[in-house]
UniProtKB/Swiss-Prot annotation:
One cellular component (GO) term of this entry: Holliday junction resolvase complex
Catalytic activity: Endonucleolytic cleavage at a junction such as a reciprocal single-stranded crossover between two homologous DNA duplexes (Holliday junction)
A Pfam family it matches: RuvC
Active-site annotation: D7, E67, D139
Residues annotated as binding Mg(2+) 2: E67
Family: Belongs to the RuvC family.
Organism: Bordetella petrii (strain ATCC BAA-461 / DSM 12804 / CCUG 43448)
Biological process, per Gene Ontology: DNA recombination; DNA repair
Protein name: Crossover junction endodeoxyribonuclease RuvC
Amino acid sequence: MRVLGIDPGLRRTGFGVIDAEGMRLRYVASGTIVVPPALALPERLKVILDNLRQVARDTRPDVAALEIVFLNTNPASTLLLGQARGAALCALADSQLAVHEYTALQIKKAVVGTGRAAKEQVQMMVQRLLSLDGTPAPDSADALACAICHAHVGPLQARLGGLSAATGLGGGTRVRGGRLVG
């Protein structure tokens, strides 16, 4: 399974692509889309949209994983981040990719083992898990971590989806805190 992970941002959007076969992970590509701050908001969103479309065309992922927007103390920042995330979602929908969303806590826990990991810890674990020669840039590392999170959690979710169909629990059933919730 090839996973495209995205760490959305209006100034810098990180992307990372990995191949996952069982617990084996292989690095494919990563980078950061740097959006010129002088552009008007619609043009900035278009830069994100166009670049992520190109990444999807070039790397041909099977699925995408996206970090869920956090609530910031500044509502305007949260809204702007949400718009960048919307541009990313449009690019993924245009590329006909299934999108799975994870919180920063879930991503850190899947990659480092604790949801309170520092950025440097995430970068170090991404480097180790993917056998990279150097430490990935922060935005790329976050996107790769999102992809790794899906590689670890996605197959379990798929199996639980089959379980929910067999047990009649419904499609909205998820795992939260080690328990099935509806």
